[in-house]
C-alpha cells in the first residue's frame, strides 16, 4: 500500500491555495512519486503486464504498487479502447484513501478520471478510467455484467488477506478471463472440455441482453488482464492457481525497527498497552503511536482510559491525541487518522487489523502489538458462527512491526514473550476454511454457477464444512422447489436489516415482526415529517424520535440505506416490490422458508433443542419471546456465553417445516 501524505484528504485540494503553493505542492508530489521503490521498475512492470494475461506482483507495504501501477497502465495505453482499470480492496477505507491520493497526484478532482465506489457511495463518472472499489462491490457488478465487460484490467490488491470475497472473486475472475478469451467473434464458443463453472458462466453470458454482448464485442480481441497484488512474500499459491502465472517482486522501503518483548506473560493486555502508550509518550522522541486492538469495544475502552489518565498529568504532558479506526466507523471519521498532528502533539492511533496492510498512516514511529486479533470461526456440526479473539500469525506480527519503519527508524513493543512469538503459526488460515459457507453458496448461485461444490476455489474449503453446506444446500433447493415465491418483498427487506426495538413495538409473533413494527413506525414518522418540513429537518426529527424511543438511529439509518439499495436492485431486475400489509401469517411462513435450517423445538424443561444439530439452547433474554416459550421457533443467530442462546427468534408452526423439507422433518403426533 502507498504511504499517504498527511494532508491528502481535504475536499478540495486547490481551495485557498495560491499559485505558488499549488506549484510547490505539485513538485513535492512528483518528487514523492519518483522516490517510491516501484518507480525504478515502471517500464519492466508495464512490459510484464503486456506479455502476461495474469501477473502476480509481490511488493512490501510502502512500495507504491497500489497508487502507481494503475497510473502507469493508464499512461501506457491500457484504457485506449475505452476500458477501465479496476482495483479492488478488502476494505472501504483503503479504496477511499487511495483514490483520493491518486486523484491528487493526477491533479484532477476526484470522480473524474479517478474515482472510487463502495456500498452506498459511488464517486465515479462516465470519464472514470481508474476505479478503486471494494471486492464485494465488484462481485455485485458481476451479477449484472458477468463478462465485467467495461474492465480492460482488474487488479486484486491485498490478496494475501484471503477474505471470503477475495477467494470468490479470484475464482470468478479466472472464469471470466477464460470466457472473454474465447469470445473472439463476440459470441462465446462453448468448450465442453471446460469445467462446470465455465459452462455456467458461458450459459449466463449467452442469456444476457444484446447490450452486454455488444459491449463485449468492442473488446473481442482484448482478453482481461488480471493482476494479483500481495504484501506476502510467498506468491506460490497464487501462481499455481493461475496455471504457473509469473510473479514479480518489487522492493519496499523499510527502515530498521527495533523489536521489544515482555519478560513475562501479560495477564491484562489492555493495561499493558496503556502503560506502554504512556511510557512512549513521556519518555520517547517524536513520532506517532499505532496500537493494535481487537475491535470497536476494546478501542473505545482504551480511548476512554487514555483520556482519564491524561487528566491526571501536568498540562504540559497532555499533548496526546487519540484517533480510532475500525471497519464500522463512518468513513469521514476514519479519514481523521491521516490528518497531521498539531505542532508539539503526538497522535495515538487505536486500530484493528485494518491498519496492518490496508492503509499506511504517516508519521508512525512506534507500534504496540498485544498479539491478538478477532477472527471468524464456524462449527459446522453445531451450526455456530462465532467471532473470537485469537493470537496473530507470525506474518501478521511482522506486518504490524513493519508499520513503525515506513518514515524512519522505529520501535515495536510486542506485549508477549519472544518464546511465544516462535510458537505462532506462520500465516493466518484463509477465511474460507473457517467460516459458514451458506452465503458463499447463495452468492455463487446468484452468479449463475450451478455446481457450487466443485467451484474452482484457490483452496478448497474445510471438508466437514463443505459436506454440511452441500447437504444444507440440497435441502435449500428442494425447499425452494416446493415453496412458491413470496410476494411481499417490501416487508422482508425491512426485516433483514432492522435493529434495536422497544417493548412498545413488541409483537407476540416474535422478534422479526417486532423489528418490522419499529421500521414501519420510523418510516411513517419520517414520511409525515417530510410532508411539512425539509428532508434535512425531517431527518433531524427522526433522530430525536429514535432517541425518545431508545432506538439506535445509526442502525436505523443503515437499515434504510440497505433497504433503498436492495429495492433499486430488485426493480432493475424487473421484480415487483409489494407488502403483505397486516397478514403476519404469510410473513412467518416466509421466515420459516428462510430459516428452516435454524429451527428449534421446545423441550419438557422449557429449553429448546436445535433440530439439526441437537444442541440445547435457551431463547435470549432480549427476545420478546423469552417468557412466551412457543412450541417451535426459527432463529437468526446462535451465541455462546455461559449458556447457548438463540437470538432474533420467531414463532412458527412445525408443520410448515415438514412441508418445506420433509427429508429433514418428520410428521410428529
Each model region followed by its residue ranges:
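Charge-dense polyanion-binding interfaces
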Residues: 315-322, 334, 479-498, 641-648
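Short, intrinsically disordered, low-complexity terminal segments
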Residues: 469, 518-519, 535, 552, ...
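Leucine-rich, amphipathic alpha-helical/linker segments
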Residues: 469-529
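Amphipathic alpha-helical interaction segments
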Residues: 496, 502, 513, 527, ...
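N-terminal leader/propeptide and maturation segments of large enzyme subunits in energy/redox metabolism
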Residues: 525-554
Amino acid at each position: 500500500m502507498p504511504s499517504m501524505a498527511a494532508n491528502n484528504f481535504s475536499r478540495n485540494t486547490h481551495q485557498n491555495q495560491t499559485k505558488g503553493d499549488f506549484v510547490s505542492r505539485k513538485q513535492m508530489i512528483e518528487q514523492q512519486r519518483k522516490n517510491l521503490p516501484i518507480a525504478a521498475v515502471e517500464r519492466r512492470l508495464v512490459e510484464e503486464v503486456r506479455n502476461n494475461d495474469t501477473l502476480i506482483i509481490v511488493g512490501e507495504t510502502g512500495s507504491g504498487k497500489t497508487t502507481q501501477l494503475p497510473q502507469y497502465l493508464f499512461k501506457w495505453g491500457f484504457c485506449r479502447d475505452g476500458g477501465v482499470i479496476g482495483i479492488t480492496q478488502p476494505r472501504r477505507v483503503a479504496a477511499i484513501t487511495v483514490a483520493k491520493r491518486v486523484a491528487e497526484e493526477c491533479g484532477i478532482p476526484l470522480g473524474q478520471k479517478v474515482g472510487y465506489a463502495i456500498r452506498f457511495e459511488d464517486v465515479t463518472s462516465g470519464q472514470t478510467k481508474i476505479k478503486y472499489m471494494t471486492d464485494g462491490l465488484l462481485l455485485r457488478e458481476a451479477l449484472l455484467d458477468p463478462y465485467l465487460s467495461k474492465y480492460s484490467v482488474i487488479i486484486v490488491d491485498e490478496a494475501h488477506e484471503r477474505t471470503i470475497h477475495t477467494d470468490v472473486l479470484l475464482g470468478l475472475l479466472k472464469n471470466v478471463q477464460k470466457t472473454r478469451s474465447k469470445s473472439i467473434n463476440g459470441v462465446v464458443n462453448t468448450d465442453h472440455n471446460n469445467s462446470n463453472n465455465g459452462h455456467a458462466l458461458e450459459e449466463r453470458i449467452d442469456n444476457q441482453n444484446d447490450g452486454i454482448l455488444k459491449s463485449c464485442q468492442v473488446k473481442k480481441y482484448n482478453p482481461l488482464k488480471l493482476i494479483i497484488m500481495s504484501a506476502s512474500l510467498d506468491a506460490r499459491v497464487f501462481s499455481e492457481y493461475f496455471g504457473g502465472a509469473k510473479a514479480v517482486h518489487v522492493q519496499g522501503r523499510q527502515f530498521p525497527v527495533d523489536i521489544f518483548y515482555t519478560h513475562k506473560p501479560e495477564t491484562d493486555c489492555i493495561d499493558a498497552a496503556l502503560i506502554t502508550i504512556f511510557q512512549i509518550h513521556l519518555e520517547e522522541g517524536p513520532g506517532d503511536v499505532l496500537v493494535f486492538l481487537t475491535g470497536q469495544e476494546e478501542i473505545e475502552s482504551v480511548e476512554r482510559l487514555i483520556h482519564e489518565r491524561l487528566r491526571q498529568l501536568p498540562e504540559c504532558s497532555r499533548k496526546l491525541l487519540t484517533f480510532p479506526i475500525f471497519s464500522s466507523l463512518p468513513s469521514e471519521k476514519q479519514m481523521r487518522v491521516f490528518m497531521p498532528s498539531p505542532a508539539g502533539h503526538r497522535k495515538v492511533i487505536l486500530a484493528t487489523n485494518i491498519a496492518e496492510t490496508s492503509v499506511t498512516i504517516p508519521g508512525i514511529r512506534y507500534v504496540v502489538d498485544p498479539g491478538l486479533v478477532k477472527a471468524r470461526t464456524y462449527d459446522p456440526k453445531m451450526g455456530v458462527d462465532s467471532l473470537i479473539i485469537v493470537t496473530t500469525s507470525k506474518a501478521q506480527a511482522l506486518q504490524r512491526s513493519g508499520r513503525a519503519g515506513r518514515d524512519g527508524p522505529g520501535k515495536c513493543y510486542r506485549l508477549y514473550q519472544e518464546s511465544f512469538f516462535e510458537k505462532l503459526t506462520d500465516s493466518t488460515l484463509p477465511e474460507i476454511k473457517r467460516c459458514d459457507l451458506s452465503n458463499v453458496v447463495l452468492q455463487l448461485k446468484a452468479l449463475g454457477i450451478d455446481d457450487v461444490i466443485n467451484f474452482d476455489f484457490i483452496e478448497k474449503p474445510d471438508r466437514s464444512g463443505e459436506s454440511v453446506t452441500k447437504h444444507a444446500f440440497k435441502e435449500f433447493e428442494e425447499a425452494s422447489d416446493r415453496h412458491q415465491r413470496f410476494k411481499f418483498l417490501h416487508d422482508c427487506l425491512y426485516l433483514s436489516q432492522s435493529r434495536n426495538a422497544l417493548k412498545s413495538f413488541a409483537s407476540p409473533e416474535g422478534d422479526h415482526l417486532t423489528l418490522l413494527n419499529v421500521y414501519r413506525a420510523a418510516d411513517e414518522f419520517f414520511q409525515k415529517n417530510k410532508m411539512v418540513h425539509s428532508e434535512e429537518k425531517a431527518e433531524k426529527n427522526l433522530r430525536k424520535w429514535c432517541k425518545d424511543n431508545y432506538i439506535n438511529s445509526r442502525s436505523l439509518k443503515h437499515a434504510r440505506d440497505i433497504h433503498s439499495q436492495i429495492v433499486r436492485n430488485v426493480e432493475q431486475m424487473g421484480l415487483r416490490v409489494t407488502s403483505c400489509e397486516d397478514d403476519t401469517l404469510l410473513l412467518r411462513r416466509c421466515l420459516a422458508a428462510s430459516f428452516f435450517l435454524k429451527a428449534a423445538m421446545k423441550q419438557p424443561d422449557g429449553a429448546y433443542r436445535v433440530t439439526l444439530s441437537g444442541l440445547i439452547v435457551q431463547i435470549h433474554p432480549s427476545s420478546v419471546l423469552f417468557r412466551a416459550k412457543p412450541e417451535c421457533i426459527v432463529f437468526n443467530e446462535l451465541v455462546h456465553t455461559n449458556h447457548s442462546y438463540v437470538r432474533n427468534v420467531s414463532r412458527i408452526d412445525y408443520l410448515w417445516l415438514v412441508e418445506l423439507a420433509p427429508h429433514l422433518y418428520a410428521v410428529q403426533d
